[in-house]
Structure formats: structure tokens, C-alpha cells
Regions:
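Catalytic phosphate/metal-binding cores of nucleic-acid and nucleotide-processing enzymes, i.e., regions
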Residues: 1-116
Length: 116
């Protein structure tokens, strides 16, 4: 991803996800790049967001990266946030594997599920 394009997408995501959130503790923040132990582009607790603004989608690679960076950050869920060409931020894609979706759903329902 071109650095300026990626930075713009990260900032647009942060701003969109923070709309209407007045609690500073709930706000999404952009992370500084940390190299080999990267913690993702966005701190959106309980998620780590990996922002992608690219022409060719590698969903498996994006999700694996998001999950790895969530583990590095010590948060439960990773999500790839993919820019959709010629569309607004809200029309982008939030992609996770089914295992993560299952865990998110269980948390929302307040039930336990085994960590796969």
C-alpha cells in the first residue's frame, strides 16, 4: 500500500469510527508502526484493525495479519478494514475469519465459547 494512501485510509477510518463517541476511552486511535511485533494500524478495543487500501485483495493474508497483530497487542479480536474503491468509508469491508466472528458473537451474547 502506498504510504500516503494508507495513512489517509487509516485516518478516515479513525474519524468515521469515532463519530459520536464522546468517551475518550472508547475512541479509536491510530497506532505507531512497531516493526516485527506490529500491533496493527488502529486500536479499536477490543479489536485491532489492520487497514488496507489496495487494488488486489488478499483476504486470507489480511485476516492472518490482523489476527497476528491482535495477539501482539494483547486484544481479543483482529479485523481487516479494507477500502472499497470509489466508495465512502462506511462502504468499506470489515473482514474476519469465522472463528473470530463466533467469538465476537459469543461475547455480545454474554456466553462462553471455546477459543479455537
Amino acid at each position: 500500500m502506498h504510504k500516503a494512501k494508507g495513512t489517509a485510509w487509516e485516518s478516515a477510518l479513525r474519524d468515521y469510527l469515532n463519530e459520536g463517541l464522546t468517551d475518550r476511552n472508547a475512541q479509536v486511535r491510530r497506532n505507531a508502526q512497531t516493526g516485527v511485533n506490529d500491533i496493527g494500524d488502529l486500536d479499536a478495543y477490543p479489536f485491532t484493525g489492520e487497514a488496507k487500501a489496495v487494488k488486489a485483495y488478499d483476504l486470507a493474508g489480511f485476516v492472518e495479519q490482523a489476527n497476528r497483530e491482535a495477539r501482539n497487542a494483547g486484544v481479543p479480536f483482529g479485523v481487516a478494514l479494507i477500502k472499497r474503491p470509489r466508495k465512502g468509508v462506511g462502504d468499506g469491508y470489515a473482514v474476519m475469519d469465522v472463528r473470530t466472528f463466533r467469538r465476537v458473537r459469543a461475547r455480545l451474547l454474554g456466553v462462553d465459547t471455546p477459543d479455537d
